[in-house]
Design a protein with these regions (language model features):
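Short loop/turn segments that flank or connect secondary-structure elements
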Residues: 1-203
């Protein structure tokens, strides 16, 4: 099920996350080596929310309006990815929704770790839907805390101490706006469950 547009609050969420990224980037200084064409974080499948999926779909619609050739190439990459990934997809390959049981989560941990994101343009090494990218992508690079502790990109913070890394921590969504927007979408009859980028932009 495709929703026409993200809820109104998504724009504010993106602004908050992007501001947090800018602040963490400033504090990180030269330890943060992210740059255009550094696409290591674009390799390997990761889960996204339905809010991310709708934002990507809107971004693809916008791309279609001003560069239909790039949009068609992106859709082709996504369809090819769905074809490759569907046989072992730990969820429903018809809907693209990931299963949320423990066994499926274990399977997903080792699923398609070498698969390039279909939104990544292989010719330029840059994201074709950068302004519409998922929250995970917006928070990659600076230190971000999860249940496993404080994680950083393996290419960044070489030589930094634990204290220096902690001082650059990025708080992604402290007010849990994303969770509220997802509930709003579900209450309005939108899909629930997590998916992956390829399924989000293949239709």
């Amino acid at each position: 099920m495709r929703t026409s547009a993200p809820p109104a609050g998504d724009h504010a969420l993106v602004q908050i996350v992007d501001a947090a990224l800018a602040d963490a980037t400033r504090r990180s200084g030269p330890w943060l080596v992210c740059r255009p064409e550094c696409a290591q974080c674009c390799m390997g499948v990761f889960s996204i929310s339905q809010l991310d999926a709708v934002r990507l779909q809107q971004g693809l619609d916008d791309l279609q309006r001003h560069d239909s050739q790039r949009a068609a190439a992106l859709r082709k990459r996504a369809l090819e990815a769905v074809t490759r990934l569907s046989p072992a997809f730990p969820g429903d390959p018809k809907t693209g929704i990931l299963a949320d049981d423990d066994h499926a989560e274990q399977l997903f941990a080792d699923f398609a770790n070498d698969e390039p994101c279909p939104v990544l343009d292989p010719a330029t090494g840059t994201c074709d839907l950068y302004s519409a990218r998922p929250i995970t992508c917006r928070a990659f690079g600076p230190p971000v805390r999860s249940e496993d502790g404080l994680g950083v990109c393996e290419l960044c913070f070489h030589g930094a101490t634990d204290e220096q890394i902690a001082a650059c921590e990025m708080e992604v969504d402290p007010d849990e706006i994303e969770s509220k927007l997802l509930k709003e979408m579900q209450d309005a009859g939108g899909p629930s469950g997590r998916t992956i980028v390829a399924f989000a932009v293949a239709d």
